[in-house]
Amino acid sequence: MTQDELKRLVGQAAADYVIQNVPEGAVIGVGTGSTANCFIDALAAVKSRYRGAVSSSVATTERLKSHGIKVFDLNEIESLQVYVDGADEIDASGAMIKGGGGALTREKIVASVADTFVCIADGSKRVPVLGAFPLPIEVVPMARTAIGRRVTALGGVPVLRVTQDGAPYITDNGNEIIDVKGLQIVDPRGFEAQINAWPGVVTVGLFAERGANLCLLGTPNGVETIVYPG
């Protein structure tokens, strides 16, 4: 199977999971990125079962609306049973690196209020140690250089994310992103807490304190379901 085929496979598997485990009339939390898009496309077939969705980005909102799925502001929702999103990397504990699509802050906010985080990914995203994929940090623009120095002191290589024309990439929240290369993150929870404590950091793309509860992993042999303790 190609990577795109695996993404569609797990997108459908996530829709099936929602149908089986989330009651009709609920609101679904939806992530951002190419794999999350496959879930949205599969969810569209059963959209009449659910009130709608909470979106983690402008791009996801547009895709949901294009399928006729109602989008709620998180402030309108009292509870969220499930959040479905992809990952750039996921380890054996369910900790993830996320934010390759630039939506890490809103993804983390929506994930934090969901009862269950379902990660959907192809098998290449499963790693023994996080860090081969550059770690995104969303930063207030004026703190960019100071945070870069802190990252360098920890052994990382900070790279400002830019657009095709070389301008800084701007998030939906009006901030910038530093992508940190060269890390081996052996203590994801501790590293997440450390970076989040730096002034000027909006959030880091480590999802360890609130990791995945379940991963639907696309493999050449089908979908592997991994349940994480705790």
Curated annotation (Swiss-Prot):
MF-aspect GO terms: ribose-5-phosphate isomerase activity
Residues the record marks as active site: 107 (proton acceptor)
EC number: 5.3.1.6
BP-aspect Gene Ontology terms: D-ribose metabolic process; pentose-phosphate shunt, non-oxidative branch
Cellular component aspect of the GO annotation: cytosol
Residues involved in substrate binding: 32-35, 85-88, 98-101, 125
Pathway: Carbohydrate degradation; pentose phosphate pathway; D-ribose 5-phosphate from D-ribulose 5-phosphate (non-oxidative stage): step 1/1
Classification via SUPFAM superfamilies: D-ribose-5-phosphate isomerase (RpiA), lid domain, NagB/RpiA/CoA transferase-like
Family indicated by similarity: Belongs to the ribose 5-phosphate isomerase family.
Official protein name in the record: Ribose-5-phosphate isomerase A
The organism of origin for this protein: Burkholderia ambifaria (strain MC40-6)
